[in-house]
Amino acid sequence: SGEIIVNGEKVVYGQTTTKRYIGYLPDVPEFYPFMTAAEYLHFCGEITGMKRTENEERCKELLELVGLGNETHHIKGFSRGMKQRLGIAQALLNRPKLLICDEPTSALDPVGRKEILDILLAIREQTTVLFSTHILSDVERICTDVAFLNNGVVGVQGKLSDIKTRYRSEEYQLETGNDTDMLILQQTFPNMQQIGRNQ
């Protein structure tokens, strides 16, 4: 629990005043499959009330940014990575102050992951990017500040460089769920030392 402040305004569930500051990319974005990327973005711009010329310019700018500027196929034929890139373009349409991404690189191949991370790096100067991930190399590549959750509670939070310095170690502690897991670890890492056993 707690409060969320975006651009100086408190976020209140059910109220729309802060929504204009926020863009959101879900883990698996959904689109109208019969549209092209350009048609879909224009449609979203119309729904939000953008003026025609502004809509056209912004859509062109965003499609170029995410590498879909020359894409003319319908969305139904897009790869997962292409859909993620279109999702980022849609989330940036209203020039948000905060972009929230839920697992933006999950289930992507290495090339797709790199493309998404490159886009997120490129837009860091325009907006604050908050994203969740289990891929620590992605965190190291683009994050300046991090928060590690443990069972839904923030365990460690701060500048990534400070956390890496504070927790630097040549030792690692692993907890196993059962004796079989422990046996596998001992066979894989013969120099491993067992320091305790929970009953």
Q: Language-model segments: which ranges?
A:
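Conserved ABC transporter NBD signature motif
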Residues: 2-13, 17-18
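Conserved ABC ATPase "signature" region
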Residues: 42, 46, 53-70
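Hydrophobic anchor residue at the start of the ABC signature
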Residues: 88
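Conserved catalytic motifs of ABC-family nucleotide-binding domains
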Residues: 95
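Catalytic Walker B motif of ABC-type/P-loop ATPase nucleotide-binding domains
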Residues: 99-102
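ABC transporter nucleotide-binding domain
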Residues: 115-199
